[in-house]
Amino acid sequence: MRKNLLDLILVVALFFMISGLHLAPGQELDDLLVIKKGQSRAVTSADPNPNSNADRIKIIAPGETKVLADIKGPGIVRHIWLTFNEARPNWLEPAGSARPDEIVLRMYWDDSLEPAVETPIGDFFGAGFGYRPELKSLPVQVESGDGYNCYWPMPFYKRALITVTNESPNKNVRSFYYHIDYTEEPELAQKTPYFCAQYRNEFPEKTGQDYLILEAEGGGHYVGTVMSVRSRSPFWFGEGDAKFYVDGEAKPTIQGTGT
């Protein structure tokens, strides 16, 4: 691929996990026929004062980190919803707010000091370059460009810590609302895998070299990639073949015909 074709590549590689992602029509409703042991819980930005409607984090200043959830396990995060003020100037922030690609989501499982998930919010939900498009898929949805939903199941044995950081150099995050649904579980099966998401970017892309999407160790399922590409050429950029190397292979087990 010629160097002058690509300006920037942003990738979120998602890997983990739990089999059974292929759901038959109506399967979700059939699940209601079985009483499960877990108990539904939620952590939200709701104001504890019932007479107030300030159900949000009002401001996240540049460089500031807020804890969205700190949950004792064992449990499974089932759904994350969030929304926040758009980046362009408006009555809330006349100078504009931080973009989705400047707001970083991190998730830590159990005793780990390193995040299993570390990615800009926009890219995690499938929207690269700070844009807020509408997106519909099984695991993530962006409604009307500003309501972010994630349905990936995220199990943890001891603790789940979810944070958000404003990495804009000079813009606030305004009116950050969130709702995190999870279940308290009596126990998790041994060797239940963790959900992980890895963010990478390259500017500019290097001529003649494969772009590394994911490098990971251990057992698990690779479940998908969000790739955002900005081209400096009007021509099609997607002729690079995707290649999968498993367990130290010298040649790829899977090689596609182009991205």
Predicted regions and their residues:
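Bacterial N-terminal signal peptides
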Residues: 9-20
